[in-house]
Amino acid sequence: MKVLAAIALSATAFTGAVAAVLTQEAFLNNPRIHHDQEKYLIELAPYRTRWVTEEEKWALKLDGVNFIDITEEHNTGFYPTLHSASYVKYPPKMQYAEEVAALSKNLSKENMKANLERFTSFHTRYYKSQTGIQSATWLYDQVQRVVSESGAAEYGATVERFSHPWGQFSIIARIPGRTNKTVVLGAHQDSINLFLPSILAAPGADDDGSGTVTILEALRGLLQSDAIANGNASNTVEFHWYSAEEGGMLGSQAIFSSYKRDRREIKAMLQQDMTGYIQGALNAGVEEAIGIMVDYVDQGLTQFLRDVVTAYCSVGYLETKCGYACSDHTSASKYGYPAAMATEAEMENTNKKIHTTDDQIKYLSFDHMLEHAKLTLGFAFELAFAPF
C-alpha cells in the first residue's frame, strides 16, 4: 500500500493529519472524509489524485484538464499505459467486407438528424437534472424500439436501464451471441454547461449527442443482419450510452466495475465522443478524417480500429492524443479491458463550442457522422464473429 501523497486543496487540518497516516485504501474507504465535506477524489493521471469540490471539478474542465472521479470506484490497479500490449488477438484483416458493405447502405443520415434534433431539445442532459432523466428515458425508448423492430428481442436481445444514485441512468443494449465474450460500443449521453450546470442550457449536439445518435444508427444497421439479430454471431455485442461522463466517467466506471466483479469477458471496447464537427479541420487546411486516439489505449485494438477505418470509411484517419481520462474508454481500461477511442478530428481541431449553449446541430456534418456510423458497424460486425 502507498501512503496518499496529495491532500485536497482546502482540506481541514484534521483531514491532513489523517491522510498522513492512512493508507490509500483506508483513506478511500472513509466516508466521513469526502461525503461530510462534499469532496470528490479525482485522478488527473495514473496515481495522481486530488480532493476537490464539485465547483472545482467544473473549473478544471473549463481549463481543459481531464480527470476521472474515483470517489466511489476505488483504485483497482488496472491503469492504462501509453504503449499497452494487447492480451487479445484481433483479426489481421477484414473478413466480412461484403456483409458490412451491404449493411452500411442502410445507414441513414436522416435518422441521425431527426434523433439528434429531438435529443438536443431537452434543456440540458446534465446527469443530476430532471431533464437529464427525461432525455435518458427518451433515448431508452428509441433503443428499445430499434431492438424490437429488428426482431432481435425474440432471440434474447435486451435493453437495460443501469441505475445510478444521481438520477440519470445509463443504457445497455445487449445482443447475445453464441458465447459471452463481449464487444462493447460506447458513447455518453449526458451534456453539461460548465458555467452553471444546474441552470443553463446544454444542448450538447456534438458532445456527445453526435456519438449517441451515431452508435444508435449503427445498432439499427447492425441488426439488419439476420445472423446478428438471431443470436448466431460468435460473440455478444453490447451498445452502451453512459450517464455522467462529464462528472468524471461516473456511469461507465459503475458499469465496468460491475463487469469486473461479475468476471465478464470484455474483448474490446470502442468509445466515440464527438463525431460531427469538421469545420475546425477544414479551417486549418487539414483533410476531413476520423481522429484515432493513440495514448492511453490498447495498441492492438487501436491498430484494428485503423484497419476498420481504412476498409469501411470514405475518409481516412489521423492519429491524435487526448491525454489521460478524456472519455469513457478510460473506465474500460481501468478495469483491465482493452479499449480504443475515435473522435471527429485531431484534438486541436475538434469543436470548441462544447460545454456551452452554442454546442448546436447547425455546426455539425451528418456526412461525417455517417462515416463514424460505418466505422461502428464495421467494428462491431467484424468482432462479433472474431475467433477470440
Curated annotation (Swiss-Prot):
GO biological process: proteolysis
Record: residues binding Zn(2+) 2: 207, 246, 355
Cofactor(s) listed: Zn(2+)
One GO CC term, this protein: extracellular region
Sites where a glycan is attached: 106, 180, 232
The keyword Ribosomal protein is annotated on this UniProt entry: no
Root EC class: hydrolase
Signal sequence, renumbered to the chain: 1-19
Keywords annotated in UniProt: Aminopeptidase, Disulfide bond, Glycoprotein, Hydrolase, Metal-binding, Protease, Secreted, Signal, Zinc, Zymogen
Residues at which Zn(2+) 1 binds: 188, 207, 273
Subcellular location: Secreted
Pfam families listed in its UniProt record: Peptidase_M28
Cystine connections: 322-326
Note on how the cofactor is bound: Binds 2 Zn(2+) ions per subunit.
E.C. no: 3.4.11.-
Pro-piece positions: 20-88
Subunit composition and interactions: Monomer.
Similarity remark: Belongs to the peptidase M28 family. M28E subfamily.
Protein name: Leucine aminopeptidase 1
Gene source species: Neosartorya fischeri (strain ATCC 1020 / DSM 3700 / CBS 544.65 / FGSC A1164 / JCM 1740 / NRRL 181 / WB 181) (Aspergillus fischerianus)
